[in-house]
Amino acid sequence: MSDVLPARFLTPVDLAELLGVPVETVYQWRRKRTGPRGFRVGRHLRYDPQDVRAWIEQQMTVGIA
């Protein structure tokens, strides 16, 4: 997984492309607080690749249970 995620903060478009989902899904996750933790830089939404990795691993674990 570390080879897949870039070393920079991700935009919502980056996250959507990485996960293969529409950008609107990323925004819905944010509104519902079900997606990876994001933060604002001024008006811009960003995601830390480490938080995204942790969220993906959590989703994989939830899917198993």
Sequence positions of predicted segments:
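Major-groove DNA-recognition helix of helix-turn-helix-type DNA-binding domains
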Residues: 18-46
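Hydrophobic aliphatic residue packing
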Residues: 11-12, 21, 41, 45, ...
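Polyanion-binding surface elements
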Residues: 1-28, 58
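A short, Lys/Arg-enriched interface patch at domain edges and termini
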Residues: 50-65
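Serine/threonine-rich, low-complexity intrinsically disordered segments
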Residues: 13, 36, 63-64
